[in-house]
């Protein structure tokens, strides 16, 4: 089967406001670093991670996904009724069943004719 008129028209993301840097973590671990004679900067050097971002406790992944989907839909300029599929990819879920993609589909206001696929680990 060949598909026609399929494309990624818009891309959106939502970043959490809370930022915790590797330096912040090392500051909390300073007594341990001093006791073990570890140089500052080791965490970023070993992980390659400069900063981490966190949503507030209790934030549901599907809520962030729905917010982001709405942004992407708006940026695309495509009418909601023209969407044929929603593919939701995430490591985290709101609950075991139904799939988080179902809630995102509903919250984004996509039509019932729009197929839903939830890709998770």
Regions found by a protein language model. Give the residues of each.
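Conserved "HGTGT" condensation-loop signature of ketosynthase/thiolase-family condensing enzymes
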Residues: 1-84, 105-110
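Compact, aliphatic and Gly/Pro-tolerant "microcore" segments centered on a short helix or tight beta-hairpin
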Residues: 104, 112-117
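Poly-acidic low-complexity segments
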Residues: 79, 99, 118-121
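N-terminal start-of-chain detector that recognizes signal peptides
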Residues: 58-59, 90-92
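Active-site nucleophile and cofactor-binding loops and adjacent substrate-binding regions
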Residues: 57-59, 115-121
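Short glycine-rich or small-residue beta-strand-to-loop segments that form or flank ligand, phosphate
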Residues: 85-91, 118
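Short Gly/Thr/Asp-enriched flexible loops that form oxyanion-binding sites at enzyme active sites
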Residues: 92-105
């Amino acid at each position: 089967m060949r598909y026609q008129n399929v494309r990624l028209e818009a891309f959106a993301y939502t970043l959490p406001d809370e930022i915790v840097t590797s330096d912040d973590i090392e500051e909390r671990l300073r007594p341990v670093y001093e006791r073990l004679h570890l140089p500052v900067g080791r965490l970023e050097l070993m992980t390659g991670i400069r900063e981490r971002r966190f949503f507030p406790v209790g934030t549901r992944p599907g809520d962030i996904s729905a917010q982001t989907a709405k942004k992407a839909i708006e940026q695309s300029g495509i009418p909601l009724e023209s969407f044929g599929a929603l593919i939701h990819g995430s490591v985290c879920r709101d609950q075991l069943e139904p799939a988080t993609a179902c809630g995102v589909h509903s919250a984004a206001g996509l039509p019932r004719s729009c197929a839903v696929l939830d890709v998770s680990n």
